[in-house]
């Protein structure tokens, strides 16, 4: 019997390791989606820079999270013999890999907001600080119970802050960090003339659409695999993700009046919003959550660019920041059993946790980017921006003229 139990335990550990490894690879692939979404949106003279930022940011994120960030979040260090950290078929290692892909999404989100005028090396420095310290602080508070906030919310309001796959922990955090960076950078040259918005058309709708589709497919790994074990897998998460994606698509199509940029960001808005409550909501609630997010993105992107003069190139603040906030709140609404959900959530806890995420992101964003701006500078020179980051930073364009 002991041998049988040992064999069963080994099978469980190996299956869970494979499961979360597949999830990590799927979310890793989403970074290609971030890259092509940005490549398709920016002007051609900044496409190489977009690709280079996403890959470089991921590399820096890995180092920052491996050596510092993961320890801050979960108190786990890998500075031990390989025989120790490879226990249970290396489940702890692939869990780190999976959560790393979440952490690395933060600078990938920011990259889209600061595109076309941010300096390359200072952004890598910002990535290191954000992934090593700011993101892990809030991640640990929510997903590891650090500092006792979750226990206090549970005792005071009957439920802790619920964010199953990161509407607030990942997306709102990235979006509000990006807002701080965008405000400190200022708009691109020529974006506003005499107070009026000047249109900068996307360089490639096909690349933009490709990026959107890669993100959509990978998102099912992002959400479903957030269970982190086979025993915790729920088909409800998959279907809710699907319904929110569809709701966001249809809403953006209607409100955006057939604009392909809005259309291909609509499903992403829905998926951002459903992350928090995808394991709790009824599919109809998920559809409503996604639809509201899709419309919210279109309205707020238009207002931010035209009325508020916030030159957020990919609209990452409305897409991730505002839709992430909506996702945290929506979980407290549509996750209630009275709304067809599984229950076990408190709207007050959701509001407190979401607000804390926004505050941490804004304070951290202004601290990091403000310090770098003061000490080293954030922005390309006027001449560098005019010629584009491809030639100014990387000395090569996206397309050869030969």
Regions found by a protein language model. Give the residues of each.
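Hydrophobic alpha-helical transmembrane bundles of multi-pass membrane proteins
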Residues: 1-402
């Amino acid at each position: 019997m002991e041998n049988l139990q040992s064999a069963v335990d080994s099978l469980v550990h190996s299956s869970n390791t494979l499961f979360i490894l597949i999830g990590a690879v799927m979310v890793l692939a989403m970074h290609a989606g971030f890259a092509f979404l940005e490549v398709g949106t920016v002007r051609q003279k900044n496409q190489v820079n977009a690709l280079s930022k996403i890959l470089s940011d991921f590399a820096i994120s890995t180092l920052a999270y491996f050596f510092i960030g993961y320890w801050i979040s979960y108190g786990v260090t890998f500075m031990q013999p390989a025989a120790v950290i490879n226990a249970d078929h290396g489940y702890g290692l692939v869990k780190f890999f999976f959560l790393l892909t979440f952490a690395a999404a933060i600078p990938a989100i920011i990259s889209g907001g600061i595109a076309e005028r941010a300096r390359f090396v200072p952004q890598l420095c910002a990535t290191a600080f954000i992934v090593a310290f700011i993101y892990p602080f809030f991640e640990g508070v929510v997903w590891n119970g650090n500092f006792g906030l979750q226990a206090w919310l549970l005792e005071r309001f009957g439920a802790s802050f619920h964010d199953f796959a990161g509407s607030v922990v990942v997306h709102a955090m990235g979006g509000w960090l990006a807002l701080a960076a965008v405000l400190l950078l200022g708009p691109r040259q020529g974006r506003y003339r005499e107070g009026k918005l000047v249109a900068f058309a996307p360089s490639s709708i096909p690349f933009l659409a490709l990026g959107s589709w890669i993100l959509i497919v990978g998102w099912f790994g992002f959400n479903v695999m957030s269970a982190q074990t086979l025993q915790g897998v729920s088909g409800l998460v998959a279907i809710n993700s699907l319904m929110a994606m569809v709701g966001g698509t249809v809403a953006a199509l209607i409100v955006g009046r057939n604009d392909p940029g809005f259309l291909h960001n609509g499903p992403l808005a829905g998926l951002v919003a459903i992350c928090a409550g995808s394991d709790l909501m009824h599919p109809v609630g998920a559809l409503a959550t996604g639809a509201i997010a899709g419309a919210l993105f279109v309205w707020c992107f238009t207002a931010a660019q035209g009325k508020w003069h916030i030159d957020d190139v990919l609209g990452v603040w409305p897409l991730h920041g505002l839709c992430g906030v909506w996702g945290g709140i929506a979980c407290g609404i549509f996750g209630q059993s009275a709304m067809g959900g599984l229950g076990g959530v408190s709207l007050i806890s959701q509001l407190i946790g979401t607000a804390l995420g926004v505050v941490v992101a804004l304070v951290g964003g202004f601290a990091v980017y403000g310090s770098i701006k003061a000490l080293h500078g954030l922005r390309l020179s006027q001449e560098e921006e005019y010629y584009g980051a491809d030639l100014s930073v990387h000395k090569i364009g996206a397309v050869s003229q030969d």
